């Protein structure tokens, strides 16, 4: 695997642990599926392979979405936000995006519904 392009790396703002936020959106629906963490290596792997790769803070290692579950994310595009501290991955989701098996990590707890 190649390293992250220095031109991209220089634009990223990371936290004290060297991580930044990744927001994952489904290409077909525009629905936000999940929020995860990435490090430079995870982003480099994602850009190189188009397989969504994240960094697990609890395990202290990278993980490729769907490698064990089969619930994969094929990356269509990656965008950097205006502050440089968040990337947006637009993906084609196969199966549930959430570790609970739900389609999104935001299916379970509606705190405020639409004002009808």
UniProtKB/Swiss-Prot annotation:
Chief location bin: cytoplasm
Cofactor(s) in the UniProt record: Mg(2+); Zn(2+)
Compartments, record wording: Cytoplasm
Family annotation (SUPFAM superfamilies): HisI-like
Residues annotated to bind Mg(2+): 81, 83, 85
Transmembrane segments: none
Protein name as annotated: Phosphoribosyl-AMP cyclohydrolase
Known EC number: 3.5.4.19
Swiss-Prot/TrEMBL catalytic activity: 1-(5-phospho-beta-D-ribosyl)-5'-AMP + H2O = 1-(5-phospho-beta-D-ribosyl)-5-[(5-phospho-beta-D-ribosylamino)methylideneamino]imidazole-4-carboxamide
General function of this protein: Catalyzes the hydrolysis of the adenine ring of phosphoribosyl-AMP.
GO molecular function per UniProt: magnesium ion binding; phosphoribosyl-AMP cyclohydrolase activity; zinc ion binding
Lineage: Bacteria, Bacillati, Actinomycetota, Actinomycetes, Mycobacteriales
Pathway: Amino-acid biosynthesis; L-histidine biosynthesis; L-histidine from 5-phospho-alpha-D-ribose 1-diphosphate: step 3/9
Record's GO cellular component terms: cytoplasm
Key words of the record: Amino-acid biosynthesis, Cytoplasm, Histidine biosynthesis, Hydrolase, Magnesium, Metal-binding, Zinc
Protein family (similarity comment): Belongs to the PRA-CH family.
Quaternary structure (record): Homodimer.
Signal peptide: none
Highest taxon listed in the record's lineage: Bacteria
Cofactor binding remark: Binds 1 Mg(2+) ion per subunit.
Record-linked Gene3D superfamilies: Phosphoribosyl-AMP cyclohydrolase
Binding site for Zn(2+): 82, 98, 105
One example of a Gene Ontology biological process annotation: L-histidine biosynthetic process
